Design a protein with these regions (language model features):
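N-terminal helix-turn-helix DNA-binding module of bacterial transcription factors
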Residues: 1-60
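Periplasmic-binding protein-like
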Residues: 108, 116-122, 176-179, 207-208, ...
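Central regulatory/effector-binding core of bacterial HTH transcription factors
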Residues: 83-128
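Hinge/beta->alpha junction and helix N-cap segments in small-molecule ligand-binding domains
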Residues: 67-76, 94-102, 152-162, 177-222, ...
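Flexible loop/turn connectors
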Residues: 226-233, 237-314
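N-terminal helix-turn-helix/winged-helix DNA-binding helices
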Residues: 2, 41-79, 88, 98, ...
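Flexible loop/hinge segments that line or gate small-molecule binding clefts
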Residues: 121-161, 240, 266-276
Length: 314
């Protein structure tokens, strides 16, 4: 029995396009719609009865899924998504998951039952294979590069290389970095970049698994200062975490950058106030483009650039 992937292959289009045709989505070119309809006829495909019935109406709601609503990094992406959705007369709902797979499944079930028209995963715990099981019910966008679903992607490997190259150019030798999840996509890419350093500059003891908040940054600083051997530079996951490190180092008499240099990812208000060197990530644009991917059949997956901005912390 044919399925939605077979139709996509036969028609030479994406699974998302097939889903949009089945669900009478307006943002599909006539050429692609005809290809899909012909493929369905050739393969004798009968669309899922539930999906067809529910597609007669649109909720005009897009869900944005991420772990913590208090994190400025995610909120900046959300801001871009809300702005773009509003311009198309769509609404955004937030689904906070705390990296709980059951909560992510609930969001996908909302798509299946047509409570929402699409899902944007800023980050996720579920496997891509599990998420793909739901793509026939509507568009799903990820923020990591993959071979199965549309994505908006920042090359974390290249971003990390920019930070490392800058620190090496400033003659820092003992470079460390922080990650939130060892198995996360961004963490894996940064680890690959770190592994390109000369072997005598790689320090496993300077790779810190920590949180994302300002408070957790302070706690990490306290952990670091208990070590006998200290890094002379740190690349930090986000601005809030970096602000916590910076504040606690200052409290303990550790000078930035004289004793420890800091680089952060993001470029929000906290890094600007503290004059932190940053890898500027186009978070607002990520949110905007992810909504475009949900709504427009002509939009394609995209890699967005990062930029090094040097300030006084290195």
């Amino acid at each position: 029995m044919s399925n939605i992937r077979d139709i996509a292959k036969e028609a030479g289009v994406s699974v998302t396009t097939v889903s949009r045709v089945i669900n009478h989505h307006p943002y599909v070119t006539e050429e692609k719609r005809n290809k899909v309809m012909q493929a369905m006829k050739t393969l004798n495909y009968i669309p899922n009865h539930l999906a067809v019935n529910l597609s007669r109406g649109k909720s005009r709601i897009i869900a944005v899924v991420f772990p913590w609503i208090t994190n400025p990094y995610y909120l900046r992406i959300l801001e871009g998504a809300i702005k773009q959705a509003s311009s198309h007369h769509y609404h955004i709902i937030v689904i906070e998951t705390h990296y709980n797979e059951d909560e992510e499944i609930k969001a996908l079930e909302m798509l299946k039952h047509r409570s929402i028209d699409g899902i944007i995963f800023i980050t996720k715990q579920l496997s891509i294979e599990t998420i793909c099981d739901y793509e026939e019910y509507g568009p799903i966008v990820l923020m990591e590069k993959n071979d199965h679903l549309p994505y908006i992607f920042i090359n974390q490997y290249e971003a990390m290389k920019k930070a490392l190259n800058h620190l090496m150019s400033e003659d820092y030798k003992k470079i460390g970095y922080t990650v939130h999840r060892n198995n996360g996509f961004s963490a894996n890419e940064r680890t690959k970049a770190y592994a390109t350093l000369p072997e005598d500059m790689q320090y496993k003891q300077f790779i810190y698994v920590s949180g994302l908040s300002l408070t957790e940054g302070k706690q990490l600083a306290q952990r670091i200062l208990k070590q006998m051997n200290l890094p002379d530079a740190l690349i930090v996951t986000n601005d809030a975490h970096c602000a916590g490190l910076y504040a606690e180092f200052q409290n303990q008499g550790i000078k930035v950058p004289e004793d420890i240099a800091l680089i952060s990812y993001e470029n929000g208000e906290l890094s600007q106030v503290n004059n932190i060197t940053i890898i500027d990530l186009p978070l607002l644009q990520m949110g905007e483009r992810s909504v475009e991917l949900i709504l427009s059949d002509s939009a394609t997956s995209e890699e967005l650039p990062s930029k090094l901005i040097i300030r006084k912390s290195t």
